[in-house]
């Protein structure tokens, strides 16, 4: 039973990994922004750094590319602004945990 769970976890990890290789659902304006930023970008944005101006410029982690995660910040004046940072989505963290656990068990 344990082997079946490990195999299923590895399959989920591989499917998730292959889906992270492609570009996520882009709208037309995001695609134009991506093309413009791709020409001027020289380095990727590291984990936990701000990616508000370049949402597709995050670096690659151990297994997956970091995703630009955004939140809305409200200032004391009541003005709302969007702030984004490169981070690991929860489902990628879970996949990395399963792979790490599998490496410990099977060496």
UniProtKB/Swiss-Prot annotation:
UniProt keyword terms in alphabetical order: Disulfide bond, Knottin, Secreted, Signal, Toxin
List the GO terms this entry assigns under cellular component, sorted alphabetically: extracellular region
Q: What is this protein called?
A: U1-lycotoxin-Ls1t
Q: Which family does it belong to?
A: Belongs to the neurotoxin 19 (CSTX) family. 04 (U1-Lctx) subfamily.
Which Cys pairs does UniProt list as disulfide-bonded? 44-59, 51-68, 58-86, 70-84
Q: What domain comment accompanies this record?
A: The presence of a 'disulfide through disulfide knot' structurally defines this protein as a knottin.
**Maturation-removed propeptide residues:** 21-41
**From the UniProt record, which GO molecular function terms apply?**
toxin activity
Per UniProt, subcellular location reads as: Secreted
Q: Give the tissue specificity.
A: Expressed by the venom gland.
Instruction: Give the signal peptide as a residue range, or say none if absent.
Output: 1-20
Q: By its UniProt entry, which InterPro entries does this protein fall under?
A: Spider_toxin_CSTX_knottin (IPR019553), Spider_toxin_CSTX_Knottin_CS (IPR011142)
């Amino acid at each position: 039973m344990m082997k079946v769970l490990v195999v299923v976890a590895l399959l989920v990890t591989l499917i998730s990994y292959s889906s992270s290789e492609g570009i996520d659902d882009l709208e037309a304006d995001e695609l134009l922004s991506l093309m413009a930023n791709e020409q001027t970008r020289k380095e990727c944005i590291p984990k936990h750094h701000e990616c508000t101006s370049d949402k597709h410029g995050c670096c690659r982690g151990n297994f997956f590319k970091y995703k630009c995660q955004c939140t809305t910040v409200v200032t004391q004046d009541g003005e709302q602004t969007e702030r984004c940072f490169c981070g690991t989505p929860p489902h990628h963290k879970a996949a990395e945990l399963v792979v790490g656990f599998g490496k410990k068990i099977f060496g």
